[in-house]
Amino acid sequence: MQSNQAEMGPGSGPEIERRLRGWAAGKGPLHVRLAAALKAAIERGDVLPGTRLPPERRLAKALSVGRSTVVAAYASLAKQGLVARRQGSGTWVEPVGDYARGRAGELATRAQHRLFAVSSFDERHGAISLFAATPDSVAAVGELSAQAAEEIDRVSEHHGYWPLGYPPLRQEIAKRLTARGLRTAEAEVLVTTGAQQAIALTAAAFVGPGEFVVLEDPTYPGAIDAYRQTGARILSAPVGPTGIDLDLVREVLARADVKLIYATPSFQNPTSALMPIGERHRLAQLASDHGTLVVEDEAHAELAFDAAAPPPIAAFADGASVVTIGSLSKVFWGGLRVGWIRAPQPVLSHLGRLKAVFDLGSSLPSQVLAALLLQRADEIIPIRIEELRSRSALLGSLVSTHLPGWSFAEPAGGLVLWTKLPHGSASELAEVARANGALILPGSMTSPSDWFDDHVRLPYVARPEVLEQGVRRLARAWQAYCGQDTRREREVGVIG
């Protein structure tokens, strides 16, 4: 890792402000706000371990505050174990230790806990879920169930354990990837229990406590949980119209020993960004140059409304620098719980041994059904895409009609609409929405840096009548929330 003796940027006001990102907008005394902003910058990796923070007087001048404010902020960070104050040497960001592992344990699985909570609430109280991007089943799931039962009966004399996956399913996945431009053999495919297990396996196999991982910001919440669970230090990179910001990734790779980059190049969750071929080439080259592993999540790749997504990043990589993961749950049925990992055989063998420790192999009946579905994929997927295209247009129209201040870009594929609030907090709105019978995912839950609390991720996977009723409930919640905001502003005005 580079820059172990480097100060936090050149010490200029604009550079520090960029790293602290609007620190003064918080609540409480100035030194509390500054400490919170510095803590967040350290946790998201904008300020790396071993970095010397600016001298108190210089930072005070750059931020237009008193020196005592910076002194108090640094003291607070030292008390939390985030920095060390060295006599005559300044204030330094501490290496990863017990604090980071504790923080990982505290924050891990928050999205899963939230999902379990809202699912339970949904069942008990009849709330409409606009929370999870889990589609209902295609008709072929029911149609092929009898044929799957016959196949299961045929193989029932076998013990049923295939740690790497049911061979016919591995063959079908390999064919599908090859057709998408990534030449793949059956021996390079590992079947997993959904893409979530695939992500968790890469985290367990390749990342240890204190090691650096780059995640998109925003990104799939389950990926944040999986990599936090390892005790990794997460460095966030913003997502634009063409995917993860590769200029920033290049800078991060130059100054930190990054173990792994997680990216969703095809209809990114939640922004629906699509990475073009040139950027895929570039990311593969960056990973190869720096000896960093790319884990690309292709769960939404086949859900293009118009032009097909480019080939996976692994198609442009040499050697073992890219691992590709995917899911059949997003295409055929959320309850199918079948995912996969594609990697060079030596890497796959390592992942397969690790998966065997977890479960000895995924459910055979689901795999048998998945293989039959893939055999008819060219017939089934266009039907699913037309359904999603229609529901995406409907959801966009509903949001524009009932929530006219909310903004969004029309997705070209995938499963979700990434909406921006005109003001306020999506986390606070989520509580009001729940009271009004609608469950939503605040944007902050998609962010490893806890940003995007002014966004809401809205899936368009539900039936049209459910989408319409859900948005109407959300609109009532938004009106109620805006009324609360107005009352708070008036109370603050009176106090002032």
Task: Walk through the language-model features, giving the residues of each.
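Active-site PLP attachment segment
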Residues: 88, 315-350, 362-365, 454
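Conserved glycine-rich beta-strand-loop-beta hairpin in the small C-terminal domain of fold type I
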Residues: 371, 388-396, 406-420
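Short beta-strand "wing" residues that participate in macromolecule-binding interfaces
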Residues: 84-85, 184, 440
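Conserved PLP-binding active-site segment of the aspartate aminotransferase-like
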Residues: 65, 343, 418-423, 440-479
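Glycine-centered flexible beta-alpha turn that most often forms the glycine-rich phosphate-binding loop
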Residues: 297
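N-terminal basic, amphipathic alpha-helical segments
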Residues: 1-150, 352, 356-362, 372, ...
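Conserved core of the PLP fold type I
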Residues: 156-290, 302-319, 467, 482-496
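Structural signature of PLP-dependent enzymes
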Residues: 157, 351-358, 374-396
